[in-house]
């Protein structure tokens, strides 16, 4: 972990990890969640990873900044200590190598050819990826409560927080359609499948959108929205063989059964909203 700050919502914290191998950082995020939850319990508190516990304030996302490297070697960083309080692997990071997403033209913003193809792959599969990155019923409160920078549109651009993907700096981009309840192993696997599909099949991502998506839509652009419910996202995933292949053998079946059951149990429940809206309603 290299940085943390108080985010917009009351009691909300943002934490950032050093760039590293996708599997290693998935391990770190999972370990942090467990430690955070345990420390909170010891202080009689709840470490809440729920995506949208309150409407009208920022939700909890988990944006993933990505680049694709060749080469590089693992290096142990003891941080100036003679001995370490955990396994060496915890303090090991990839160092060196070549970032294949770096610009390769005079346009210092535009990702290189490999990066553009990778973006194309993500754009193609964004609907199905949403089922992994926004994997709970509550996740979609984040997308419906507009005005808090949650991505609703399947597009990409530079520093454009209304898109599902933005180029956040030369040589890397930020996948935004992912929240605090996601599984980082499945998310990483899904994104790598998108990269592979985009690069192998030369998928063109189209032109980056410089306007906010709301402005673009008002100007007449035909925009594509992300799935706006868990049910819609699961349908998109069921149709996408590339993303399903990120969950091999029985894994996709288990994921589908578990998440479809969650969606159907929600549909079968009477909520407080139902009572507030219809209890004293005269048809």
PLM feature spans:
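Active-site acidic/histidine clusters and adjacent loop/turn architecture
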Residues: 1-30
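A broad detector of the eukaryotic-type serine/threonine protein kinase catalytic domain
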Residues: 18-22, 170, 242
């Amino acid at each position: 972990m290299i940085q943390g700050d108080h985010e917009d919502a009351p009691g909300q914290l943002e934490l950032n990890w050093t760039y590293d191998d996708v599997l290693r950082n998935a391990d770190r995020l999972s370990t942090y969640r467990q430690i955070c939850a345990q420390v909170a319990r010891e202080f009689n508190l709840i470490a809440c990873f729920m995506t949208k516990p309150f409407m009208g304030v920022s939700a909890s996302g988990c944006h993933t900044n990505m680049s694709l490297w060749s080469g590089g070697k693992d290096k142990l960083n003891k941080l100036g200590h003679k001995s370490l309080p955990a396994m060496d692997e915890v303090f090991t990071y990839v160092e060196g190598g070549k970032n294949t997403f770096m610009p390769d033209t005079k346009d210092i913003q535009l990702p290189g050819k490999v990066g553009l193809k990778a973006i194309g792959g993500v754009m193609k599969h964004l609907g199905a990826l949403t089922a992994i990155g926004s994997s709970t019923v509550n996740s979609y409160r984040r997308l419906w409560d507009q005005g808090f920078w949650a991505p609703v549109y399947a597009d990409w651009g530079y520093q454009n927080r209304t898109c599902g993907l933005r180029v956040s700096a030369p040589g890397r981009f930020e996948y935004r359609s992912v929240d605090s309840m996601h599984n980082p192993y499945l998310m990483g696997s899904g994104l790598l499948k998108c990269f592979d599909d985009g690069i192998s099949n030369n998928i063109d991502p189209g032109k980056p959108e410089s306007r906010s998506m709301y402005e673009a839509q008002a100007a007449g652009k035909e925009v594509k929205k992300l799935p706006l419910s868990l049910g819609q996202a699961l349908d998109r995933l069921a149709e996408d063989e590339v993303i399903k292949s990120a969950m091999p053998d029985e894994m996709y079946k288990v994921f589908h059964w578990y998440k479809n059951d969650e969606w159907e149990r929600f549909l079968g429940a009477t909520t407080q909203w139902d009572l507030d809206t219809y209890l004293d309603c005269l048809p």
